[in-house]
Design a protein with these regions (language model features):
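Extended hydrophobic leader/signal-anchor segments used for secretion and membrane insertion
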Residues: 1-182
């Protein structure tokens, strides 16, 4: 049987962990456990209407999937619950911008290119199915429209613009900075 001090120690540690987690979320810190980005802690920065306007190639951003769900493929992935590690379809989707308005995305021999330069993180061919479920796909080559961005995942099987195409800058909720990654 545990003594009262041991029980109170366990309760105190649990309360500290829960309180620290809640405080981190309020401070704009997010934990990423998905393989789509390096695992670790991320700080949400510039979470206002200027985030989408100011974001450029190489920036990590979070996309509000409810805002982007007018895109039929984003809506498909949301209904499957595949746009977040937790399975909650209302989570923000964190990706890297690899193309902006005016850029051209092409595919050659299974590699994806933006303006003739291969993606540095994710050069693998797109999956066509998950089990027997066909996945949406984007016809390439594709010129990115002004006011849109092309997103890439760090993981070869990550859900990104290879499946849903360019997304509107207005769906960018925040820019993201790594606080600590593995």
């Amino acid at each position: 049987m545990r003594t009262k001090p041991t029980v109170w120690l366990i309760v105190g540690v649990l309360a500290g962990v829960l309180g620290g987690t809640a405080g981190a979320v309020q401070a704009g810190v997010r934990i990423n456990l998905s393989p789509s980005m390096p695992k670790g802690l991320y700080r949400l920065v510039q979470c206002d209407e200027t985030a989408g306007r100011d974001a450029g190639v190489g920036d990590w951003v979070v996309i509000d999937t409810t805002e982007a769900s007018s895109n039929p493929s984003v809506a498909f992935f949301r209904t499957q619950g595949w746009l977040s590690y937790s399975g909650r379809s209302d989570d923000l989707l964190m990706k890297t911008i690899v193309g902006v308005g005016g850029d051209e995305v092409t595919e050659k021999v299974g590699r994806l290119y933006v303006n003739g330069t291969p993606f540095t993180k994710n050069a693998s061919r797109r999956q066509r199915t998950v089990g027997t479920l066909p996945l949406p796909s984007v016809e390439l080559p594709q010129r990115i429209n002004e006011g849109e961005v092309w997103l890439s995942s760090d993981h070869e099987k990550g859900i990104d613009s290879r499946y849903f195409g360019a997304v509107a800058r207005s769906s960018i909720a925040c820019k993201v900075e790594a606080a600590w990654t593995l």
